[in-house]
Amino acid sequence: MEQGEFEVLLEVGQAYLLKKDYEKAITKFSEALRINPHDPETYYYLGLAYEGAERYSEAAQTYEKTLKIDQGHGNAEIRLNEVNKKITEGGKSKK
């Protein structure tokens, strides 16, 4: 049952992420990580949600966790570099 619940939480979180409802996405991804705290993709999606919510420090920490679990996660490395630039620039970077 937990694996099924994990997958549902992940899918719902992704749907919120696509709708740019970042706070709800953060909640769902966090719940999924309580079930499976070793999934790099969930950390990556959580990082995207934090980044979308302009919570850059939390996004950076989450991308670092992704890379700690999966050192070859290229997307997390790219996003981490982008978030670190935003932090350095005071979070005022515009796309």
Question: Where in this protein do the model-derived segments appear?
Answer:
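Conserved structural position within tetratricopeptide repeats
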Residues: 31-34, 67-68
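Register position in tetratricopeptide repeats
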Residues: 18, 52, 82-89
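Helix-start (N-cap) detector for alpha-helical repeat units in TPR-like alpha-solenoids
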Residues: 6-7, 40-41, 74-75
